[in-house]
Amino acid sequence: ITLGKPGEEAFLEMQAEHGIVSKGAKVVADEKVENGYMVSNLCGGLGELLFDTIEAPEDGDYSLTIVFRKGGLKRKFLVCLVNDEKEYDCYFPSSKGFTPDGRLQIVINLKKGLNTLKFYNPVASRMDSAQRQYTNMGRELQRATREFAEKNGTPEKPICYSLCEWGMNQPWKWG
């Protein structure tokens, strides 16, 4: 990973072996990646990668670049949890062949001083995926109604948000 202020050169680079792996994740040798090592098993509710020595010079937004190796037509998902507070969803695009040096960039917010970044994929089942997607949709509906009310000077109107799915993902357990 690399970190820098948006539009500026990166000031920090951390390799796979600088992180702490747990819950099944491993640092493995791979001659196809730039420094020769990568982290595997960060999928399907398995594995975590933690960088706990991320030093930011000031509070604010930073560009986080994740260098990845993947292959296949399926998109991949990963969560970046910053300081055990804010989650950032990362969606890795599909590719027709193996990509040893793909890059995904997101903007994250860091505080001045020491920060932690934890990478993991909490989606181990269809139910996990549905719960995350519906939670995100509910949060965005709340944001949209709040913004509309503020923009138009009107009271915020409630939205009835109903989950069904014909029971496929058991929404009564998490909805």
Language-model-derived ranges and their functions:
Residues L3-R126:
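Extracytoplasmic
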Residues G4-E8, S125-G175:
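Active-site neighborhood of glycoside hydrolase catalytic domains
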